[in-house]
């Protein structure tokens, strides 16, 4: 999988992947970002939750279970002093509502 990220202005970047869709990316305001896109850590968590949701839907569907609702929330603990500001723990809270299709 290839993704290309190009700087547009100062902390503002735009990423494009194989799907051709553009993803605006910007830094947090405290380092000079101006709200022109998603902050990279937030984008990471969107990706994690999206992957979990898609794979969960696929697995349940293959087992004959119909999903009415899938919801994934993320949270994390992060070292905020110094650099890099690494995540030390990532939490996923998954809520699924399903019903089993009769045989």
Task: Specify the residue positions occupied by each region the protein language model found.
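Alpha-helical metal-binding/catalytic segments enriched in His/Glu/Asp
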Residues: 51-52
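Extended beta-strand/beta-hairpin segments
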Residues: 1-46, 57-103
